[in-house]
Amino acid sequence: MYRILLTGFLPFGGESVNPSLEAVRSIQVEFPNVELIRLEVPTIFGEAERMVIEQVSFCRPHAVLCTGLASGRTDVSIERVAINVDDARIPDTAGQQPLDVPIQPHGPAAYFSTLPIKSIAQAILS
């Protein structure tokens, strides 16, 4: 069984809906031997990371796809690089607003996706 972990954030910043979570909820898998595991994560620094790590340890997925909302964007964006810094434009739902704080102090400055992001974006937008 091929397991895919999909994450989406709960609403924050005064919004009643988070499109990332709605997208995760709406995806239907129709492939044999594919198990889709959905995880709703809070918009709380540290807590979201803890929950994803815990779920990865528990279900041992073959792939992890984390979705999120980038306010102001009108199209789907696939990110190639995850920067190892928490830097919040607005406070999270617990009132935390870290600025230039390393997520993993001893980790690399950034993490690069190994997914074919251009073909994924093209498939989503077509």
Give, region by region, the residue ranges found by the protein language model:
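N-terminal catalytic or cofactor-binding beta/alpha core of small enzyme domains
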Residues: 1-126
